[in-house]
């Protein structure tokens, strides 16, 4: 069970994962050691799964963000998702209900790279029965922060 202090620590780290335990402790009026122990416990429980930099793909030359809706053979969903999660181009992957069996977000350098990615890595998967691609025109908000 999370208490008020745990939630405050999570909110602070959610906004700035580089903030030191000392800074967090000062902000909350608790010791650095208390913060360290709580973060360790939250990590061991799987609540904190990592600390990541938020990177703008366009500034690194990745111009294409594609949303792929995948139709997968029902008996092969788990196996196929495990293969897809290993692809570097896929930055988010979800098993879904509704029209698609899975939805993923892929980031690529350009349209040519997208075509190559689909032809060489997605379409050859024998368990993928089809794929609908939607290109992102602009990003107004990404999902990198939790609403806590």
From Swiss-Prot:
Query: Out of the domains of life, which is the source?
Result: Archaea
DNA-binding region boundaries: 21-40
- SMART domains with a match to the protein in the record: HTH_ASNC
- The HTH asnC-type domain extends over 2-63
Q: Which InterPro entries match?
A: ArsR-like_HTH (IPR011991), AsnC-type_HTH_dom (IPR000485), Dimeric_a/b-barrel (IPR011008), Tscrpt_reg_AsnC-like (IPR019888), Tscrpt_reg_AsnC/Lrp_C (IPR019887), Tscrpt_reg_HTH_AsnC-type_CS (IPR019885), WH-like_DNA-bd_sf (IPR036388), WH_DNA-bd_sf (IPR036390)
Please give the Pfam families that the UniProt record associates with this protein: AsnC_trans_reg, HTH_24
For this chain, one GO molecular function annotation is: sequence-specific DNA binding
UniProt keywords, alphabetically: Activator, DNA-binding, Repressor, Transcription, Transcription regulation
As for what it does, the entry says:
Participates in positive as well as negative regulation of transcription. Binds to its own promoter.
What is the protein's quaternary organization? Homodimer.
Official protein name in the record: HTH-type transcriptional regulator Ptr1
Specify the species: Methanocaldococcus jannaschii (strain ATCC 43067 / DSM 2661 / JAL-1 / JCM 10045 / NBRC 100440) (Methanococcus jannaschii)
GN (gene name): ptr1
């Amino acid at each position: 069970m999370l208490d008020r202090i745990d939630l405050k620590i999570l909110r602070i780290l959610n906004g700035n994962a580089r903030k030191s335990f000392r800074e967090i402790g000062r902000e909350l009026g608790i010791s650095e050691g208390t913060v360290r122990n709580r973060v360790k416990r939250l990590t061991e429980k799987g609540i904190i799964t990592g600390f990541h930099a938020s990177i703008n793909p366009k500034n690194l030359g990745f111009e294409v963000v594609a949303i792929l809706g995948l139709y997968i053979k029902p008996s092969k969903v788990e196996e196929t998702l495990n293969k897809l999660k290993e692809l570097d181009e896929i930055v988010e992957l979800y098993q879904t209900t509704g029209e698609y069996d899975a939805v993923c977000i892929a980031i690529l350098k350009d349209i040519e790279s997208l075509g190559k990615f689909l032809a060489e890595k997605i379409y050859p998967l024998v368990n993928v029965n089809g794929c609908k691609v939607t290109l992102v025109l602009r990003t107004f908000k990404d999902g990198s922060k939790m609403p806590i």
